[in-house]
Amino acid sequence: MLLSDADTTLILETVRDAARREIMPRFRALSEADINTKSAPDDLVTAADLAAEALITAQLGRAFPAALILGEEAVAANPSLRDQLADAEMAIIIDPVDGTWNYARGLALFGVILAVTRYGVPIYGLLYDPVIDDWIVSSENADTCYTNAHDSRALRLPATPPETKAGGYVPLGSLPDPHRLRVAALWPQIGRLNSLRCACHEFRMLAQGHVDFMLSTRLTPWDHAAGVLVVQQAGGTAKMLDGSAYSAVRRDGYLLSARSADVWSEIQQAFSFLLD
């Protein structure tokens, strides 16, 4: 199964259509009834998530009838859907509004993530910003590219060491309590640590060379499959903290993505205590 240029154009335009019709009109216009919780008080779902996922699922389901369509909200309603991913020759994985907490609170730091996988291996990844209408995209046989209304250019991460201490994204709130203190102790040797509460924009920042690494927990294919491919095809390194290859089928462990193999090794050594 190979994606043609026409296929990837259709996927992109479907995502842009969902953003125009379902996501942006609701931004900063949600009522309390439009916002609900899922697994925790800060795990939110909005009317925009549901409507955008429904639109993308319907349109791509018609275009790719043999594909498994795996949306975050569909899996929330029926977790067994995720079990089909490993055996799917083609799966389209959708995060309709990544960074829902930001979106629901009126912070313009959210995106749409879409990945296509083959038996769990990412072969296409899209990181789309509905606010600016720009995107970073990659596929298994192409460079990672950034595109907006005026420009399109290939992204290539530098192989040279960072000019300052390596800085990146670590979701402290997702780590077990004892590990948070260990991470805090790393600050003097690593540099700035942040979290955007949005994997889409964290991967975008890494792919453009604006940060040096990102550590991901709570593995979900809609958050990570696209970004892993984007980083790898830009010349970076993205694999599990234990050194094994990433698969969208994985449900546990830590994913470490970095601008280069050397930075990956440096950060992996610093965070190796998470493997104990």
Q: What do these predicted regions represent?
A:
Residues 23, 49, 60, 100, ...:
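Residue-level signal for inorganic ion chemistry
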Residues 37, 83-86, 137, 160-164, ...:
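Solvent-exposed alpha-helices and their adjacent loops that cap or buttress functional pockets
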Residues 55, 111, 226-230:
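Short amphipathic alpha-helical face segments that pack within enzyme cores
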Residues 82-144:
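DPxDG-like acidic metal-binding loop motif
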Residues 1-97:
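N-terminal subdomain of lithium-sensitive/metallo-dependent phosphomonoesterases centered on the IMPase/IPPase/PAP
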Residues 50, 73, 96-99, 130, ...:
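Generic detector of well-ordered alpha-helical packing
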Residues 158-276:
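An extended, acidic
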